[in-house]
Amino acid sequence: MMGLAHLGGVGAKAPALSLAEAGRKLAEPVLDIRNLVVRAGSANLVDGVSLAVRPGETLCLVGESGCGKSLTCMSALGLLDDGLVSSGSVRLFGEETIGAPERALNRLRGRDVTMIFQNPMTALNPIRRVGQQIVEAILQHTDLRGRKAEARMEELLDQVGIPNVPRHKTYYPHQLSGGMCQRVMIAMALACKPKLLIADEPTTALDVTIQAQILRLIRDLQTELDLAVVFVTHDLGVVAEIADHVAVMYSGKVVETGSVDALFDHPSHPYTRALMNSRIGFGRVPGTPLQAIAGTVPSPSARPQGCAFSPRCALASASCTSTPGMVAGRGTMVACHHIGAGVSQ
């Protein structure tokens, strides 16, 4: 992970690996996705995505809306809507989930892997008290019963920073703020001490103060539980704060991936650089204007031939009509025909 101080400049030397970090690199992935394709009819919504996350690591999926980040996560849990078809390989703790029976998936969900969503108000049951909802998760996925389950619920609410637990556990979701509801969702997600937490833009609807508290909470819990975390976001400031590794997605594909330090120091894909140029910080010269990314993400059914970013890219050329493969950049892997070109942009 890197601190927000990194936003003011680039080029810092990466620190030496600690023993814990070196051990993670040798560990088997908790989540291992290879060549994932999600189709709706003839359109590939997710198109050949490969990524992995190991115990104690945070992988951030970054990109604009419609890039396939959330679908990739839903595929990992076998939660695709009817009519969507997936292929490739998604392994959770070494077990293949694509094509797995629902019973096997249910054994993993909630116990070994959990997910928190962008809007906790829609994820929580509006007619059940929040304490009851956490107890239900405990009863479903653990052997705790009665007062022991109740005590575990109270412990979790205290762990995520809910004040006056005896009072707030009796509240309904609408009686709590957005930040408090998100803390309840995190408590529910951690009820069974999972090994993998998937967080789908959990701080987008929160103000910056509450966002910082939630990010700090997730980091602290990750350290305590050795959690692997997949964090979906479009906010590069959040990425700088929590990520170990980053996968930049565009139009259903991963276009650049690598360690957070390598990607922020040496962004090689034009889309990655465009994302950074559209935000304050990230080595920007003071006083220079922000650069909006012209155009929009193409519809999966109307992608241009070759590189999907080429219609929005200042470096586009005739070679971009062929699909670029992943090649080595400056510390990252990049899907681009023009590696090294336009780095000063």
Question: Language model features by range: what are they?
Answer:
Residues V85-E96:
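Conserved ABC transporter NBD signature motif
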